[in-house]
A protein has these predicted regions:
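A short core secondary-structure module
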Residues: 2-41
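Gly/Ser/Thr-rich beta-alpha loop segments that engage phosphate groups in nucleotides
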Residues: 3, 51-54, 74, 79, ...
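Active-site PLP-lysine loop of aminotransferase-like
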Residues: 3, 49-50, 89, 167
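Short glycine/proline-enriched turns and hinge-like loops at secondary-structure junctions
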Residues: 8-12, 51-53, 72
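Flexible, small-/acidic-enriched active-site or ligand-binding loops
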Residues: 35-66
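A short, charged helix-loop
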Residues: 56-83
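Alpha-helical interface subdomain recognition
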Residues: 59, 83-187
Length: 187
């Protein structure tokens, strides 16, 4: 089989794979060594962002893995994959929040340094409103992210819903804050 858009396959020593067993309905989780015969990893794929994480494709041809490499029990593969996606949503929310924080820090520093009409840009009321809105939204996103992480840590039933909300809010916020920061810094 094959799979596209695999993160870190070119740098990983082991691959976590979720697969079906003998055309059955149950999924299993496996740890596959990258050097196993039949494992083929493509060159890295270019992308528009997230440059620190290599993306590539995987192809498996008659790969044999010992039963000791199985994660959990037969049928646990789907829940393992769901948990990985859940953790990824929380991680993406955190990364987007970090980018937004960085953008507002740069914009605020610039607004304090840049003089317009004989005084710092940061003294302009419209700029203050813009920065205040950016920080307020960042803190709201941070609170949602912390709540989500706490729910994950405690295994609460609504964690997936909160993880999706946190990712949505943080990524939308990141786009807005970065766009506003560009406006404040002259673009």
């Amino acid at each position: 089989g094959s799979k596209k858009f695999i993160t870190r396959a070119t740098t990983a020593d082991w691959l976590m794979v979720v697969a079906r067993l003998d055309q059955g309905e149950k999924f299993i989780g496996l740890l596959v060594p990258r050097e196993a015969p039949g494992v083929h990893i493509s060159a890295e794929v270019g992308k528009l962002g997230w440059f620190g994480v290599p993306i590539s494709s995987l192809t498996f041809s008659d790969v044999r893995i010992p039963v000791t490499h199985r994660l959990g029990e037969e049928g646990d593969g789907f829940s393992l994959a769901q948990d990985a996606l859940l953790r990824a949503r929380i991680g993406h929310a955190a990364m987007a929040l970090g980018r937004a924080i960085g953008a507002v820090e740069i914009a605020a520093a610039y607004a304090c340094e840049r003089n317009t009409f004989g005084k710092p840009l940061s003294t302009q009321q419209g700029v203050q409103w813009m920065l205040a809105d950016m920080v307020t939204q960042i803190e709201a996103s941070r609170a949602l992210l912390y709540t989500t992480a706490q729910k994950y840590d405690h295994g609460e039933a609504d964690t997936a819903t909160f993880a999706s909300m946190a990712k949505l809010h943080a990524t939308d916020l990141c786009m807005k804050v970065v766009t506003d920061a560009l406006q404040l810094t002259g673009g």
